């Protein structure tokens, strides 16, 4: 079986990929994530997912390399990780009572053949109306400053929502496993038959 590389240092993506029970290693892609002018959310995450996967091709020349990127769109504005309490508070205040759409790009690059397959998965999060004290309490309790959208849906963040809509709940955490499984099977790696 071709060795798998996850082009990410994200603990969340690593934990998600472990669900497939395939051996893999993680490597930092060191990719410039600056958005381009007039680039929409879908174009941005697909470009960055592919760039992350291909960034490691010299070091890993006979591998399947997975790249992923995620942004959220709140009221038509592309946002990413808040990195500060103030930005996180602003993001959650903007999301309050609205639908926030997460765009997650996933790319599988076969560095041996040069074949790349890149997709974008959408996931909608409908927030309930949030009071400022609820937002402060949540941010203090969970400190989600390294998470797109300023929450962790796998934790206390679930209390912020009215409902969730999407094909794969793993997409919201950063790695759409249903789509990734499809891409892996197309490259000859089936997680079910690889269990051994």
Swiss-Prot record:
Its main location: cytoplasm. Belongs to the Maf family. YceF subfamily. It comes from Photorhabdus laumondii subsp. laumondii (strain DSM 15139 / CIP 105565 / TT01). The lineage of its organism: Bacteria, Pseudomonadati, Pseudomonadota, Gammaproteobacteria, Enterobacterales. This is 7-methyl-GTP pyrophosphatase. The record marks 12, 70, 154 as: Important for substrate specificity. It holds the Pfam family Maf. GO terms for cellular component: cytoplasm. InterPro entries: ITPase-like_fam, Maf-like.
């Amino acid at each position: 079986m071709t060795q798998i590389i996850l082009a990410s240092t994200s603990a969340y993506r690593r934990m998600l990929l472990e669900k497939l029970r395939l051996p893999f290693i993680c490597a930092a892609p060191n990719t410039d994530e600056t958005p381009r002018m007039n680039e929409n959310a879908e174009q941005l995450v697909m470009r960055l997912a592919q760039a992350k996967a291909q960034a490691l091709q010299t070091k890993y020349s006979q591998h399947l390399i997975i790249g992923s990127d995620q942004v959220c769109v709140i009221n038509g504005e592309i946002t990413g990780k808040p990195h500060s309490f103030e930005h996180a508070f602003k993001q959650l205040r903007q999301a309050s009572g609205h639908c926030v759409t997460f765009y997650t790009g996933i790319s599988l690059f076969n560095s041996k053949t040069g074949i790349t397959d890149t997709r974008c998965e959408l996931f909608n999060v409908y927030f309930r109306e949030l009071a400022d004290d609820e937002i402060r309490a949540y941010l203090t309790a969970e400190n989600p400053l390294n998470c797109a959208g300023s929450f962790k849906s796998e934790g206390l963040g679930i209390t912020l929502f009215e409902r969730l809509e999407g094909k794969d709940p793993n997409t919201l955490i950063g790695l759409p496993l249903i789509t990734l499984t499809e891409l892996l099977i197309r490259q000859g790696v089936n997680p079910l038959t690889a269990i051994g």
